[in-house]
Amino acid sequence: MDREYGSYNQRSMDSYGNQSYSVDEMGDSNFSRFGPYESYDSRSSVGGRDLYRSGYGYNDHEQGHFGDSYDGRYENPYRNSVDSFEGRSQGGSSWDPSFTRSKVRTGFMEDRGRDSYSSYGSFSSPYMKPATVGSRGRGMPAYPENAFGGRSNDAFGGPSKGRGRGRGQMPEYGGIRRPGLVGDYKQLGGAARGVARGVKRKMAPPFKPVGVFGKKQKLSKPGANQNKTVPPPAEKLSEEEEEKRRTEARREKQRRRREKNSEKYGDGMAFTCSFCKFRSFDEKGIEEHLSSTTHQEMLDHIQKQTKFDKPVMEFLHECIVNKFKKTAARRAQSLANEAAKALEKDVMEGVTPDDHMMKVETVHCSACSVYVPALHSSVQLHLKSADHSKSKLAYKEQIKRESILTATSILNNPLVKARYELYLKGENPFETQPEEQQQEQEEEEEEEEQQEQAAVPEQDLSEEQPAAIAAEPEGEDFTCDPLTTTDEV
């Protein structure tokens, strides 16, 4: 292909300087005023590359051996002058180099005058050349055509339709713009079809039939809904009945908790400090603890971490003291009741000599969660062990963390808030009626359960407490005794 254009190139340059034209010869053309400025541009044989690309293309080495007048595009000064002249006035030829002479109509190469050479009307069919989206690319015409087969005004300095020279321009066939569409290039030759396939164009989205890949709509049968039995609506309970049911469930839960505490602590009359996790069955022991520096340091730690005021901390201390007084009163009442003692279960019930069991006194270590025999040697051996030294430090930090949680939970209780308001007014907030006392007990036991659930994730028994898992009986926990734990009936 390039060889033929190379031989024709010499002929066109000779005719450029020798041939003359007249107005009569150009009178038959509809756009004859453009005739004198048209000339076959040798640049079309380069392959239609962009003028701003390198001068050496894919087929330049072949053109240099077969009749091409110029070894390089910009070496000959005469060629450069011709290129500059045609680039300013005409813009070069718009013939596509991908079409060989065998595909061109008869008479094109014959010297029949300027009229047949310059008119593009016979070549404006969409079956001859593919429509282009952008021009001046590889294999593309130098400038787009208009509706009548001639060149567009863009080639002669007219207004541009796209952004920049020769970009974003669309072909027009018959005066109708068809953006993104190209002619039927299936009838073109192999080279032309290859060029047309490289043209960017909008592709229509593939048609997806409904129901092939998507979900099919479930069709319900007319009589299917009639066979289904509709469950009867649940009876709506009144607010009083719902409240009564919740109260009964809460009391049953409290009863089970009291039984569990009774099995754990014996008579359930242990004196506890919820902040320090201190437990004692002696009144004197709890009194000494409440007045000790350990208890005061714990209150200072809570105030420092929670930023509570001094009256708040005094109120929390009074709550612990009030709990101690309640426990002492219930304990005195239970000791006076002989019937309660008769109903007390015997610890050794069902134990026979063959079981080889005996009742002994033990010492419980809350830091290690182990039971140590109540012997001097056993207690001293446990105190000097490495496990106890590690566990007591970790347990102390755990108590500090849980004390903050306990204090915050107590103050968030609505009943405690009401008592705190009375305390600020100078009244005694702990004198309550029997009904209020029952409600207080329910609130306190609910709070106890929440605190125990919150303290479970913070207990670390993996490495620091290896003996606790093996020695502590299942279900026992002496480390979480909230402020409001009571055993009132």
Swiss-Prot record:
Keywords: DNA-binding, Metal-binding, mRNA processing, mRNA splicing, Nucleus, Repeat, Zinc, Zinc-finger. It is found in: Nucleus. GO terms for cellular component: DBIRD complex; nucleus. Residues 1-28, 62-100, 133-181, 205-263, 431-489 are annotated as: Disordered. The keyword Zinc-finger applies. Residues 433-451 have a biased composition (Acidic residues). It holds the Pfam family AKAP95. GO terms for molecular function: DNA binding; RNA polymerase II complex binding; zinc ion binding. One of its GO terms (biological process) is regulation of DNA-templated transcription elongation. PROSITE patterns: ZF_C2H2_AKAP95. A zinc finger (C2H2 AKAP95-type) spans 273-295, 365-388. Its main location: nucleus. Residues 62-76 have a biased composition (Basic and acidic residues). Residues 7-22, 91-100 have a biased composition (Polar residues). Transmembrane segments: none annotated. A motif (Bipartite nuclear localization signal) lies at residues 200-221. Belongs to the AKAP95 family. Component of the DBIRD complex. Core component of the DBIRD complex, a multiprotein complex that acts at the interface between core mRNP particles and RNA polymerase II (RNAPII) and integrates transcript elongation with the regulation of alternative splicing. This is DBIRD complex subunit ZNF326.
